[in-house]
Amino acid sequence: MSGQVPEYQFWLLAEISPVHSEKVINALRDYLVMGYNRMEACGRHGVSPGYFSGALKRFQRVSQTVYRLVPFYFPEAGHEVHRGE
C-alpha cells in the first residue's frame, strides 16, 4: 500500500479519520502517498513506529468502511450490499 494512495483520496480519508495529530497525518501521507517506508515516514515527523502502526490501522479501517458504503450511494458500482454482518 506504500505510495499507492492518490493525494486527493488521502486528504478526503484524513478528513473523516479519527487521526487528528498533524505529525501523524503527515507521516501517514509520506507512507501512503509519497512511498516512504514506515521508518522513514516516522523519523521525518517524530512519530513512534508503534503509534504509527495503530494510526495506520485506524486509517485503513476508515478506507474499508468507505468502500463498503459505496453501493449505498452508487448501486450501479456493482458491489454487493450486505445489511449488517
Curated annotation (Swiss-Prot):
Origin: domain of life: Bacteria
InterPro entries, A to Z: Adhesin_operon_reg_prot (IPR004356), Fimbrial_Adhesin_Reg (IPR053721)
Alphabetically ordered keywords of this record: Activator, Fimbrium biogenesis, Transcription, Transcription regulation
Signal peptide, first to last residue: none
A biological process term (GO) from this entry: regulation of DNA-templated transcription
Functional note: Regulates the transcription of genes involved in the biosynthesis of F1845 fimbrial adhesin.
Protein name as annotated: F1845 adhesin operon regulatory protein
Organism phylogeny: Bacteria, Pseudomonadati, Pseudomonadota, Gammaproteobacteria, Enterobacterales
Gene responsible for this protein: daaA
